[in-house]
Amino acid sequence: QLPIAPDAAKEYMPILIGLSIAGVIYGSIVALRQKDLKKLLAYSSLAHVGLIAAGCYTLTADGLNGAVYQMIAHGFVIVGLFFAAEVIFRRFETRKIDELGGIRSQASGFTSMFMILVLASVALPGTYNFVGEFTVLYSLSQVNIWFAVIGGTTIILGAYYMLKMFQNVMLGETNTKVFKD
């Protein structure tokens, strides 16, 4: 239980979880429409923070533990992704996803590192992010199964836009600028 205003926390729990999941949906939909690499990562981060908040508002031990796991894991992964995005920007002088591409053919080591970060961000089983997201979804299912179903659906949506971004940036048509490894 949360020690501050436990009665109010219990009363408003469904509303707060609903708002948190709405934040996840909003972040995911806006990230889907992004053409800028850093903006896509920022809205993806917003979606992850919404899931963290939903885990906190379940008022269960599993929800809080999952939220903490997710905070730590997301912190490490998003820093790596933003760092990689900055490296890409400094080499290509653009953040537009459509203008990037073919980095794999020029920098295979960088592509491998970026892929590991993307897979961690989408909570591939075996990553620390998976533990956090799975625990949060489990705690949401204890409160209301529909919260967990909607939360799980947004995770699939997140995997779609992150893997699509990876495909366009790393595997897409080769950019004319040289990316030195």
Where are these predicted regions, by residue range?
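Helix-coil boundary and interhelical linker segments in multi-pass alpha-helical membrane proteins
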Residues: Q1-Y12, I52-Y69, L140-F147
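Internal transmembrane alpha-helices of multipass membrane proteins
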Residues: Y12-L59
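Structural signature of hydrophobic alpha-helical transmembrane segments
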Residues: D7-A22, Q70-F76
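Residue-level micro-sites within transmembrane alpha helices that shape
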Residues: K35-K38, A47, Y69-A73, V77, ...
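Interfacial and helix-entry/exit segments of alpha-helical transmembrane bundles
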Residues: A42-V49, V77-G158, K177-D181
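Helix-loop interface residues and adjacent transmembrane-helix termini in multi-pass membrane transporters
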Residues: A9, Q34, A61, R91-T94
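Alpha-helical transmembrane segments of polytopic integral membrane proteins
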Residues: I25-S28, F82-A85, A159-L163
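Transmembrane alpha-helical segments of integral membrane proteins
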Residues: M162-K177
